[in-house]
Amino acid sequence: MEGIGKAYLDYNATTPLDPLVIGVITESLKCEWGNPSSAHSLGKLASDRIGRSREQVAAMINAHANDIVFMSGGTEANIVALQSGLNSITKPNSKECNIVLPHVITSNVEHDSVKNYLSVQQDCGKIDLSFAQVDKASGQLRPESVLSLVNNRTCLISVMHANNETGVLMPIMEIGQALKALNVSRSQNNLPKIYFHTDSAQSLGKVKVDVKQLEVDYLTIVGHKFYGPRIGALFVKDLLTQTPLVPLLQGGGQERGFRSGTENTPMIAGLGQAAELVVQNLDKYMEHMTRCRNALISNLKDQIHDIRINFVVDPRLPNTVSLQVPQNVTAQKVLENCNGKIFASLGAACHSNSQKPSSILMASGLSPEEAGRTIRISIGRTTPDSEIEFAVKVLTEACKRA
Ligand SMILES: Cc1ncc(COP(=O)(O)O)c(C=O)c1O
């Protein structure tokens, strides 16, 4: 984009479609438009395509294809995972039904689709909700901060894999392994199983995601964050035998009854292709984003005094830079001074109309004033070096003028 005097650095908000994904979607729109439930050959063509995509998406996270259910996106996948985990304890005749109030644990930096759904359940008196706090200063979550909140009524834990604003990776594997051991002893003591969900919207296509290593029961997949279409999927461990899935949509019984509504074959085809690209190229993507990020940080530091890079911790996403501009300047002003040449954001895209400093950044240790001086820059897998150089030049001038 720098060739036309612009740099897109907002890949955590959304990514463009990869050209190969566009190709597969286009082909599918033309040839696989039959209803996947139809018994004739056009239906079979579409349902075969969906089966192939399911395998591609499963391969991206080292899962079994049977454990993938296609959905409209990350918000739906998060809500279905949460309501399913909760249902395990509230359904009539379940052995845990004597539990008066199910207890759920989440972190204080989750995406709104998790935070707001759980907060509403709490406000309705349906659950008791605890928030594990990330460490102020680092934005990191210690496994003990989550595990120490577990009690005899806990039935569900939801912690995101990577934070969309800070880029900090959360200790999902450590929590998952601890829960696996804990669930063995809970079962012996007739206590409810604790289901574990992670929202992987921001980590797929940026770091390795392996559901077996992470030891999760549910994992949210969002296509438009890894150069795929604007749909998603939910991984449910041993879906048919072990982990409950409560459908949000009832109807014709598509997706084996777990998500009714005629399948969006072309977009599902695109999601499969996007997943396959991640399988083939993840190391290359990671290497490229890390190099661009490091170049951006060192060039910005050379050019602008008094800037700070927040949340430089290990592990973190290779593509996200939380840039704190110098004192007496606001991030809003700096972005305005870029005159539309830099596409970056002050925080999550869904909060772009808010005048308030980001609650995620404040929960992660920044003061309101520091949060108001923070720009989120997120790099893509194909961002050219020249676009990084262009962004440094424009941001430097914008800070000086501000
Ligand atoms: C961490 C995280 N979870 C969930 C979502 C929701 O995805 P969607 O808006 O596609 O439903 C997003 C999107 O910004 C996200 O960043």
Regions found by a protein language model. Name each.
Residues 1-402:
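Pyridoxal 5′-phosphate
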